[in-house]
Protein backbone atom coordinates (compact mmCIF):
# COMPACT_ATOMS: atom_id res chain seq x y z
CA UNK A 1 0.00 0.00 0.00
CA UNK A 2 1.33 3.39 -0.93
CA UNK A 3 0.86 6.13 1.65
CA UNK A 4 0.87 8.67 -1.17
CA UNK A 5 -2.58 7.59 -2.42
CA UNK A 6 -5.33 10.19 -2.71
CA UNK A 7 -7.82 7.99 -0.81
CA UNK A 8 -6.54 7.25 2.72
CA UNK A 9 -6.44 3.55 3.55
CA UNK A 10 -4.56 0.96 5.56
CA UNK A 11 -4.02 -2.68 4.66
CA UNK A 12 -5.36 -4.90 7.49
CA UNK A 13 -3.65 -8.14 6.43
CA UNK A 14 -0.64 -8.93 4.25
CA UNK A 15 -1.22 -9.70 0.58
CA UNK A 16 -2.23 -13.38 0.30
CA UNK A 17 -3.06 -15.85 -2.44
CA UNK A 18 -6.81 -16.40 -2.96
CA UNK A 19 -6.54 -19.82 -1.29
CA UNK A 20 -5.17 -18.21 1.90
CA UNK A 21 -8.03 -15.81 2.63
CA UNK A 22 -11.82 -15.69 2.87
CA UNK A 23 -13.28 -12.60 1.22
CA UNK A 24 -17.05 -12.12 1.03
CA UNK A 25 -18.59 -14.68 -1.32
CA UNK A 26 -20.32 -11.98 -3.39
CA UNK A 27 -16.97 -10.33 -4.21
CA UNK A 28 -15.21 -13.50 -5.36
CA UNK A 29 -16.21 -13.13 -9.04
CA UNK A 30 -14.77 -9.61 -8.99
CA UNK A 31 -11.63 -10.50 -7.05
CA UNK A 32 -10.87 -13.51 -9.25
CA UNK A 33 -11.80 -11.91 -12.61
CA UNK A 34 -9.25 -13.02 -15.20
CA UNK A 35 -10.30 -10.49 -17.84
CA UNK A 36 -10.17 -6.71 -17.73
CA UNK A 37 -11.94 -5.01 -14.81
CA UNK A 38 -12.88 -2.26 -17.27
CA UNK A 39 -14.75 -4.81 -19.42
CA UNK A 40 -16.47 -6.31 -16.38
CA UNK A 41 -17.63 -2.91 -15.15
CA UNK A 42 -18.87 -1.96 -18.62
CA UNK A 43 -20.84 -5.23 -18.84
CA UNK A 44 -22.63 -4.48 -15.55
CA UNK A 45 -23.13 -0.72 -15.85
CA UNK A 46 -24.76 1.54 -18.41
CA UNK A 47 -22.43 4.39 -17.45
CA UNK A 48 -18.69 3.95 -17.01
CA UNK A 49 -15.92 6.52 -16.59
CA UNK A 50 -12.36 6.83 -15.36
CA UNK A 51 -11.30 9.58 -12.98
CA UNK A 52 -7.53 10.04 -13.19
CA UNK A 53 -5.87 11.36 -10.04
CA UNK A 54 -2.50 11.45 -11.76
CA UNK A 55 0.90 9.86 -12.08
CA UNK A 56 3.60 10.40 -9.46
CA UNK A 57 6.93 9.04 -8.33
CA UNK A 58 6.72 6.74 -5.31
CA UNK A 59 9.07 4.63 -3.23
CA UNK A 60 8.61 0.94 -4.04
CA UNK A 61 8.64 -1.75 -1.37
CA UNK A 62 11.15 -4.56 -2.03
CA UNK A 63 8.48 -6.96 -3.33
CA UNK A 64 7.00 -4.25 -5.57
CA UNK A 65 10.43 -3.39 -6.96
CA UNK A 66 11.01 -7.06 -7.77
CA UNK A 67 7.57 -7.54 -9.39
CA UNK A 68 7.88 -4.49 -11.67
CA UNK A 69 11.55 -5.25 -12.38
CA UNK A 70 12.62 -1.76 -11.35
CA UNK A 71 16.34 -1.14 -11.21
CA UNK A 72 15.84 1.57 -8.58
CA UNK A 73 13.70 1.71 -5.41
CA UNK A 74 11.62 4.48 -6.99
CA UNK A 75 8.81 3.82 -9.43
CA UNK A 76 5.75 5.49 -10.82
CA UNK A 77 2.16 5.22 -9.61
CA UNK A 78 -0.93 5.87 -11.75
CA UNK A 79 -4.02 6.32 -9.57
CA UNK A 80 -7.64 6.23 -10.77
CA UNK A 81 -11.20 5.60 -9.67
CA UNK A 82 -13.46 3.63 -12.01
CA UNK A 83 -17.06 4.85 -11.83
CA UNK A 84 -20.20 2.84 -12.62
CA UNK A 85 -23.95 3.50 -12.43
CA UNK A 86 -23.89 3.87 -8.64
CA UNK A 87 -20.77 6.02 -8.38
CA UNK A 88 -17.16 5.17 -7.56
CA UNK A 89 -16.78 1.39 -7.85
CA UNK A 90 -13.06 0.61 -7.96
CA UNK A 91 -10.05 2.47 -6.63
CA UNK A 92 -7.08 1.48 -8.76
CA UNK A 93 -3.41 2.20 -8.70
CA UNK A 94 -0.69 0.79 -10.88
CA UNK A 95 3.00 0.68 -10.04
CA UNK A 96 5.66 0.43 -12.73
CA UNK A 97 9.31 1.16 -13.41
CA UNK A 98 10.14 4.59 -14.83
CA UNK A 99 11.50 2.97 -18.00
CA UNK A 100 8.00 1.62 -18.72
CA UNK A 101 6.56 5.14 -18.84
CA UNK A 102 9.01 6.17 -21.53
CA UNK A 103 8.70 3.14 -23.79
CA UNK A 104 5.20 1.68 -23.33
CA UNK A 105 2.91 4.59 -24.18
CA UNK A 106 1.67 4.93 -20.59
CA UNK A 107 2.50 8.64 -20.63
CA UNK A 108 -0.22 9.26 -23.24
CA UNK A 109 -2.86 7.13 -21.50
CA UNK A 110 -4.65 10.02 -19.75
CA UNK A 111 -8.18 8.97 -18.73
CA UNK A 112 -8.22 5.96 -21.06
CA UNK A 113 -8.63 2.81 -18.95
CA UNK A 114 -5.38 0.89 -18.57
CA UNK A 115 -7.37 -2.32 -19.13
CA UNK A 116 -8.16 -1.26 -22.70
CA UNK A 117 -4.45 -1.00 -23.43
CA UNK A 118 -3.40 -4.21 -21.66
CA UNK A 119 -6.34 -6.37 -22.78
CA UNK A 120 -6.48 -4.88 -26.30
CA UNK A 121 -5.93 -7.18 -29.25
CA UNK A 122 -3.71 -9.83 -27.69
CA UNK A 123 -4.39 -12.02 -24.65
CA UNK A 124 -3.02 -10.40 -21.51
CA UNK A 125 -0.49 -12.08 -19.26
CA UNK A 126 -1.36 -12.00 -15.56
CA UNK A 127 0.41 -13.56 -12.60
CA UNK A 128 0.97 -13.05 -8.86
CA UNK A 129 -2.73 -12.57 -8.04
CA UNK A 130 -3.06 -11.68 -4.35
CA UNK A 131 -5.92 -10.44 -2.16
CA UNK A 132 -6.04 -8.23 0.93
CA UNK A 133 -8.53 -6.43 3.15
CA UNK A 134 -8.24 -2.67 3.78
CA UNK A 135 -9.67 -0.10 6.15
CA UNK A 136 -10.61 2.94 4.11
CA UNK A 137 -11.13 6.36 5.68
CA UNK A 138 -14.11 8.53 4.83
CA UNK A 139 -13.35 10.53 1.70
CA UNK A 140 -15.21 12.33 -1.11
CA UNK A 141 -15.66 9.07 -3.06
CA UNK A 142 -16.90 6.63 -0.41
CA UNK A 143 -17.72 6.31 3.29
CA UNK A 144 -15.29 4.83 5.78
CA UNK A 145 -15.35 1.05 5.93
CA UNK A 146 -13.61 -2.21 5.23
CA UNK A 147 -13.01 -3.10 1.59
CA UNK A 148 -11.36 -5.96 -0.25
CA UNK A 149 -8.91 -5.63 -3.06
CA UNK A 150 -6.58 -7.50 -5.29
CA UNK A 151 -3.24 -6.94 -6.91
CA UNK A 152 -1.70 -8.77 -9.81
CA UNK A 153 1.12 -8.33 -12.23
CA UNK A 154 0.06 -7.65 -15.79
CA UNK A 155 2.28 -7.01 -18.77
CA UNK A 156 2.03 -4.19 -21.29
CA UNK A 157 4.22 -5.64 -24.00
CA UNK A 158 7.45 -6.49 -22.17
CA UNK A 159 6.74 -4.13 -19.25
CA UNK A 160 5.47 -5.59 -15.95
CA UNK A 161 2.85 -3.48 -14.16
CA UNK A 162 1.62 -4.13 -10.62
CA UNK A 163 -2.11 -3.37 -10.78
CA UNK A 164 -4.10 -2.84 -7.54
CA UNK A 165 -7.92 -2.74 -7.50
CA UNK A 166 -9.98 -2.05 -4.36
CA UNK A 167 -13.71 -2.68 -4.56
CA UNK A 168 -15.56 0.28 -3.05
CA UNK A 169 -18.93 0.08 -1.23
CA UNK A 170 -20.96 1.38 -4.21
CA UNK A 171 -19.96 -1.75 -6.13
CA UNK A 172 -22.30 -3.67 -3.80
CA UNK A 173 -25.16 -1.74 -5.42
CA UNK A 174 -24.39 -3.61 -8.62
CA UNK A 175 -27.21 -5.97 -9.53
CA UNK A 176 -24.78 -8.90 -9.88
CA UNK A 177 -23.85 -8.63 -6.20
CA UNK A 178 -27.44 -8.53 -4.93
Swiss-Prot record:
GO molecular function, one term: chorismate lyase activity
Record keyword Lyase present: yes
Entries under InterPro entries matching the protein: Chorismate--pyruvate_lyase, Chorismate_lyase_/UTRA_dom_sf
Top-level class of the enzyme under EC nomenclature: lyase
Keywords carried by this UniProt record: Cytoplasm, Lyase, Pyruvate, Ubiquinone biosynthesis
Pathway where it operates: Cofactor biosynthesis; ubiquinone biosynthesis
EC numbers, comma separated: 4.1.3.40
Gene3D superfamilies given in the database record: Chorismate lyase-like (3.40.1410.10)
Cellular localisation: Cytoplasm
GO BP annotation list: pyruvate biosynthetic process; ubiquinone biosynthetic process
Domain of life: Bacteria
Reactions this protein catalyses: chorismate = 4-hydroxybenzoate + pyruvate
Function: Removes the pyruvyl group from chorismate, with concomitant aromatization of the ring, to provide 4-hydroxybenzoate (4HB) for the ubiquinone pathway.
HAMAP family membership: UbiC
Family: Belongs to the UbiC family.
Protein name: Probable chorismate pyruvate-lyase
Species of the source: Aeromonas hydrophila subsp. hydrophila (strain ATCC 7966 / DSM 30187 / BCRC 13018 / CCUG 14551 / JCM 1027 / KCTC 2358 / NCIMB 9240 / NCTC 8049)
Taxonomic classification: Bacteria, Pseudomonadati, Pseudomonadota, Gammaproteobacteria, Aeromonadales
